[in-house]
Curated annotation (Swiss-Prot):
Enzyme class: transferase
Main subcellular localisation: cytoplasm
Record GO cellular component, one term: cytoplasm
Species, as recorded: Rhodopseudomonas palustris (strain BisB5)
Protein name per UniProt: Ribosomal protein L11 methyltransferase
Any one Gene Ontology BP term: methylation
GO molecular function: protein-lysine N-methyltransferase activity
InterPro entries, alphabetized: Ribosomal_L11_MeTrfase_PrmA, Ribosomal_PrmA_MeTrfase, SAM-dependent_MTases_sf
Protein purpose: Methylates ribosomal protein L11.
Known catalytic reactions: L-lysyl-[protein] + 3 S-adenosyl-L-methionine = N(6),N(6),N(6)-trimethyl-L-lysyl-[protein] + 3 S-adenosyl-L-homocysteine + 3 H(+)
Keywords (A to Z) from UniProt: Cytoplasm, Methyltransferase, S-adenosyl-L-methionine, Transferase
Length: 295
C-alpha cells in the first residue's frame, strides 16, 4: 500500500452499545478506504474507540457524527493526532496483538502468517473488534474450552450470546463438527457468520438470532453436552433454569462475562439447578467458570 500521512482520533465512551452506535454510524459515513475503526473494552468496562483516517478528515464533521451517536461529551473528549507517513491501515492494527489461550490464538489478518503451526488461529478483523479475544472473559473461556476438549469431544455444542463468534469458531475448528451459535443481536449474528466464513468453518457454525432458549432451534440441537456463554452476570443467573433444562446428562458449562465478586451468586444459581463448579479462572478481575451438570 502507498505510504501516506494519516490522522488518528480516539475517545472513550461508557458502554458497548454506545461504541456500536459510533462504529456503525462512522462506518456508514466513510468509504472502506477512508477509515479504519477499532473498538476495545477497557478493564473498567468503558470502551475506547480509535479512528484511523488515510487523509485529514473534516474534524468538525467527525465530531458531529460522534456527538450524534454517543453524545456531546464523547465528541468533546475526542483527541486527534497525526501519524507519520506509513501504512495507516497497519497502524490501526498495532494494538491488536495475537492473544494465546490454550491451543488457540486470536489474531488479526496482519498476524496470520505468524501463528505457530501447533496452534489454532482465530482471525478477527480490527474493524469487527467486539469480542476479539483481548478481553479477559474471552481468554478465560478459550482456556477452559481447551481444557474441556482435551477430555474428549462433546456431541452437541452451543455458544450462547456468540458476539463475533470467537468461541463457536474455536470449538468448530478444534472439533471439526457443527456448532450452534446464537445471539439476541442480529448484527452480531451477521458478524459471527462472516467471521466463521473467514476462518474456514462457515459450513460448521450455524449462527442464529434467538432470545434466551425460546427458539425452536434449541430443541432441534439439544440437549447440549457443552454450553459456552460469555455474557453478563444478571442474564447468566436468569438463564440458569432454562439452560439446565437443555443440558445433557453430565454436560459441561463454561460461563463468563462476570466480575470476580459476582461469581459466587452465579455459581449458586447454577448449583441450585444441579451444576457444580469444577474450575474458576480469573483474568484481569474477570471470572470464567467451568461447571458440570450432576442431575
Amino acid at each position: 500500500m502507498t505510504e501516506t500521512a494519516s490522522t488518528r482520533a480516539s475517545f472513550v465512551i461508557g458502554d458497548e452499545a454506545a461504541a456500536r452506535r459510533v462504529t456503525d454510524l462512522l462506518g456508514e459515513s466513510f468509504d472502506d478506504g477512508e477509515l479504519a475503526i477499532a473498538a476495545f473494552e477497557r478493564p473498567d468496562r468503558s470502551w475506547e474507540v480509535s479512528l484511523h483516517f488515510g487523509e485529514m478528515p473534516n474534524l468538525d464533521g467527525v465530531r458531529a457524527l460522534v456527538a450524534q451517536a454517543a453524545g456531546d461529551a464523547a465528541a468533546a473528549a475526542m483527541t486527534v493526532e497525526s501519524i507519520a507517513a506509513k501504512d495507516w491501515v497497519a497502524a490501526s492494527l498495532e494494538g491488536l496483538v495475537p492473544v494465546p489461550a490454550g491451543r488457540f490464538v486470536v489474531h488479526g489478518s496482519h498476524d496470520r502468517a505468524r501463528i505457530p503451526s501447533n496452534k489454532l488461529g482465530i482471525e478477527i478483523e480490527a474493524a469487527l473488534a467486539f469480542g476479539t479475544g483481548h478481553h479477559g472473559t474471552t481468554r478465560g473461556c478459550l482456556t477452559l474450552l481447551d481444557l474441556v476438549l482435551r477430555a474428549g469431544p462433546p456431541r452437541s455444542v452451543l455458544d450462547l450470546g456468540t458476539g463475533t463468534g470467537v468461541l463457536a469458531i474455536a470449538a468448530a475448528k478444534a472439533l471439526r463438527q457443527p456448532v450452534l451459535a446464537t445471539d439476541i443481536d442480529r448484527q452480531s449474528v451477521a458478524v459471527a457468520k462472516e467471521n466463521a466464513r473467514l476462518n474456514g468453518v462457515g459450513n460448521l457454525v450455524e449462527a442464529v438470532h434467538a432470545t434466551g432458549f425460546s427458539a425452536p432451534v434449541f430443541a432441534a440441537w439439544g440437549p447440549f453436552d457443552l454450553v459456552l456463554a460469555n455474557i453478563l452476570a444478571n442474564p447468566l443467573r436468569q438463564l440458569s433454569t432454562p439452560m439446565s433444562q437443555h443440558l445433557a446428562p453430565s454436560a459441561l458449562v463454561i460461563l463468563s462475562g462476570l466480575l470476580q465478586p459476582q461469581a459466587q451468586s452465579v455459581i449458586a444459581a447454577y448449583r441450585a439447578r444441579g451444576c457444580v463448579l469444577l474450575r474458576q479462572i480469573v483474568i484481569e478481575g474477570w471470572s470464567s467458570l467451568l461447571l458440570a451438570k450432576t442431575f
